[in-house]
Amino acid sequence: MRPWCQLALLACLSLKWLTSHVTAESFLCDDSELCENGYLRFGRSMSVEEPHFRLERRSYPPVVYHKRFLRFGRSQEPDIEDYARAIALIESEEPLYRKRRSADADGQSEKVLHRARREAESEHKSLEEVSPDTKQDVEKRDADDVLDAEKRFMRFGKRFMRFGRGSSDDDESGDDDVQDLTDIGDGLGGEGEVNKRFMRFGKRFMRFGKREDGEPDKRFMRFGKSMADNDLDKRFMRFGKRFMRFGKSLPDSEVDKRFMRFGKSVDGDVDKRFMRFGKSVDGDVDKRFMRFGKSVDGDVDKRFMRFGKSVDGDVDKRFMRFGKSVDGDVDKRFMRFGKSVDDDVDKRFMRFGKSVDGDVDKRFMRFGKSVDDAVDKRFMRFGKSVDSDLDKRFMRFGKSVGSDEVDKRFMRFGKSVGSDEVDKRFMRFGKSLGTDDVNKRFMRFGKSLGTDDVNKRFMRFGKSLGTEDVDKRFMRFGKSLGTDDVDKRFMRFGKSLGTDDVDKRFMRFGKSLGTEDVDKRFMRFGKSLGTDDVDKRFMRFGKSLGTEDVDKRFMRFGKRFMRFGRSVGDSKYRSASSESVMTTDSKQTTEQATNKS
């Protein structure tokens, strides 16, 4: 019996080995050339010697990796581009290594050189003016940019998604053939440093069209043609100056900055109207914007977005009026729906449903029905209540357990365990361990380690290091440095400087100035003025006025936010006075409605 058991065990092991071998062979590509191209890799590239996936658990050999992410372009197969790149690297690395003294000094000086280059570029100065000591070293280290530039394409932290082709300005240098094979882009003045743009966060990006001069080539999403002036060629869908131009201009090119112009004017001087509709009664007040309907008196013809008709000509300054009134004095209603029971409370706004008592008819956005008339002032109520006194719930979903004090839940999902104090959960997902104190989870994903105190995770992704205190990660991406305290990263992209405290970056794009404290930028666009404190801009568009305090604008369109056009002479004062009059009337109307409510 014993030899038979050993033979059966040997047969099972043989079958297991054969099955594993067949399964491993099924994952390999049939085309060997396709496997050698280095595709199907994430995070870092495979080596040429081992181009396939490794199923066994072991680390990669210490070979040179490019760490490209979502790489598009050349493969591992050598071609003429590789030979040209090798020639460029040999010519650039020989003087570079003669100047190097030690590995430590090289790493420190490289940060200083990169910082000096960025400061000179942002301040539009020469490198010798910013840092005279590092000018010669930067010229010797231009080969590093060529080497690092080859690792871009959809890479968080440096340049990526580069498209386009070089212009005629780049063809004046002697090594054009080598440079065109390694760098594809459009440079300004032959500078190889700015040759890496196009879809690049941190400098110029999304460039379309052609330029007339090398200086104003920083156009973004340019459409149409200019008025034969190179300085005016920066408009068309450009954040910071003119954009979205419609209509035709006057013979003077100075008034060509109109945006979204419609209709016709009465006087040629006031032809800068934007989004004008309807007709005016007096030529002086023809600067209305978005005017609808007609007026009763010519003095109040400055109405904007007027609907319906009025009872008295004095109160004809209504905006967005719907329905009809009961008394002429309360005709200043805005967005009125439904009907009222009492004339005094006819200033309701956005009323739905019906009331039980005329005194509580001032409800706004009421849904459902009430049990008691005194609590009929509910807003956006859903479902039914248990007690009339608790009927003031807002946006209630689900049902309660039966206790009166826990019936004030808002946006409740799921079911409770049975205790009244835990029934106040909001937006609960998943299941609990069966204890009452951990049933208050909100938007929980993933699984816990089995202990009750770590079951309160919210939106957890990834895996923990095995300790209970780090299992509370929220929306974690990427990998940690191996320490427990830095494993709580949220939405981390790119790479860190090597220190634990800067590894907690969130959605970082672009590049830093070389200091660790400015490496925590979030969604940075555009370029800074060269100072460290203004490098933390978020979603910046356009350019500043030259002062550092205005360079921290967020979602800036022009100087003001959503600015269309500019005033001419004293027209802005007349517009401002008319707007102030309308604002005062609107405020008085709102205050009257609020007091009566």
Swiss-Prot record:
Domain of life: Eukaryota
Keyword Transmembrane: no
Region (Disordered): 98-141, 569-597
InterPro entries to which the protein is assigned, alphabetical: FMRFamid-related_peptide-like, FMRFamide-related_np
Disulfide-bonded cysteines: none
GO aspect biological process, one term: neuropeptide signaling pathway
Keywords: Amidation, Cleavage on pair of basic residues, Neuropeptide, Repeat, Secreted
Compositionally biased spans, kind Basic and acidic residues: 102-141
Pfam families membership: FARP
Gene Ontology terms: cellular component: extracellular region
Main location: secreted
Extent of Polar residues compositional bias: 574-597
Propeptide: 1-68, 75-150, 166-195, 212-217, 226-233, 249-257, 265-271, 280-286, 295-301, 310-316, 325-331, 340-346, 355-361, 370-376, 385-391, 400-407, 416-423, 432-439, 448-455, 464-471, 480-487, 496-503, 512-519, 528-535, 544-551, 567-597
Modification sites for Phenylalanine amide: 72, 156, 163, 201, 208, 223, 239, 246, 262, 277, 292, 307, 322, 337, 352, 367, 382, 397, 413, 429, 445, 461, 477, 493, 509, 525, 541, 557, 564
Location(s), subcellular: Secreted
Family stated for the protein in its record: Belongs to the FARP (FMRFamide related peptide) family.
Free-text function comment from the UniProt entry: FMRFamide induces contractions in visceral and somatic musculature as well as in the heart.
Name of protein: FMRF-amide neuropeptides
